[in-house]
UniProtKB/Swiss-Prot annotation:
Pathway: Glycerolipid metabolism; triacylglycerol biosynthesis; Phospholipid metabolism; CDP-diacylglycerol biosynthesis; CDP-diacylglycerol from sn-glycerol 3-phosphate: step 1/3. A motif (HXXXXD motif) lies at residues 238-243. The gene is agpat9l. This is Glycerol-3-phosphate acyltransferase 3-like. Keywords: Acyltransferase, Endoplasmic reticulum, Lipid biosynthesis, Lipid metabolism, Membrane, Phospholipid biosynthesis, Phospholipid metabolism, Transferase, Transmembrane, Transmembrane helix. May transfer the acyl-group from acyl-coA to the sn-1 position of glycerol-3-phosphate, an essential step in glycerolipid biosynthesis. Also transfers the acyl-group from acyl-coA to the sn-2 position of 1-acyl-sn-glycerol-3-phosphate (lysophosphatidic acid, or LPA), forming 1,2-diacyl-sn-glycerol-3-phosphate (phosphatidic acid, or PA).
Amino acid sequence: MEGYWAVLFPVLKVWFSCVIVLIMLPAMFGISLGITETYMKLLIKTLEWATHRIQRASRAEEILKESASNGLIQRDNSSLEQEIEELRRNRPKSADRGDFTLSDVLYFSRKGFESIVEDDVTQRFTSEELVSWNLLTRTNNNFQYISLRLTVLWVVGVVVRYCILLPLRITLTTIGLTWLVIGTTTVGFLPNCRVKNWLSELVHLMCYRICARGLSATIHFHNKQNRPKKGGICVANHTSPIDVVILANDGCYAMVGQVHGGLMGVLQRAMERSCPHIWFERSEMRDRHLVTQRLKDHVNAKTKLPILIFPEGTCINNTSVMMFKKGSFEIGGTIYPVAIKYDPQFGDAFWNSSKYSIMSYLLRMMTSWAIVCNVWYLPPMTHEEGEDAVQFANRVKSTIAQQGGLVDLAWDGGLKRAKVKDSFKEQQQKKYSHMVVGEDSSD
């Protein structure tokens, strides 16, 4: 037994020394030694070779269309009125006041079948399917055995991801999160002053950079001249909790979000000690009013960190942007839109919170190949004259969707856990009733 420990301790000593010197210290100061870049180049060539083998073996049939996000069904962007008018085009004009025809039934039947087969909403709450297999078991739903070489490569990949990368990533993430809790808690005991704010920003920045290395994250920031400034509000599309890690690698933010339990709750309580983050319970109406007032006070203090808000209110699978809650746009101040787009070929960053706990999700992230994403800082936006909060939110959302190459959807992300509101159904019914009996119909 003594011989076992005599061998283990030197191995662990060398392991931690390499992690600290080659990865952790450079990460803390934002320096790269080229290790991640070399790994990514090798990974890209490996996946390109695997893709070529898969495509060669499946020339007889197309594995998938351009992307699963394009869907099984080709939909038009036409409105209810436009599509029904198209169906009625060849029908003789009726002399009756009523404008109902049997062909109208075809429109509603088609929409119903389309929603049953593949709707626009629920597919945004599941992981995006890939055009070509990326050698991860969890994404092998549509790709079967191809060749012995590809199988051997997959086995080698499993060994690399679980026996080499996973221990390394767990080590780095544990160090990063531990330092974050200890550092923010310690800084929290200091009186409010410039030194406390500076130390808080330093602790957050260093710890998030270590955590990013723990995910083998490769982040490409674009248009840095548009980075959020103090006293502003940064809004971004939301894919997972690591969105915070990604953005905080390039600057510090005061965060606004839902109260969580477990590991997330521990981190939230520790971070709140050193920085004016705002956590709330979404179901409590009283919390909403308090949050709104705190946000207004924060924005009015131009010396405080920019606020980071995810207006969708839930995680979407990075193929689209769903409805932005208007509360973030009623506060006033300058909005700094940010578009985040992950590359699913290297790893699925989407957190399906209804299916995976935060620990299960982190394990999936740490056993992926890497996290690769692009972040675009967009020009600051403000309210236009005569524009209400909803219109402003939709304008910001459209800008983010266009830059990130995402689908712009008007649906509420809350449909992940709730049913469609009756008011939306009534809105569609009113539209059709106006077509049938005219605009003067009673509601």
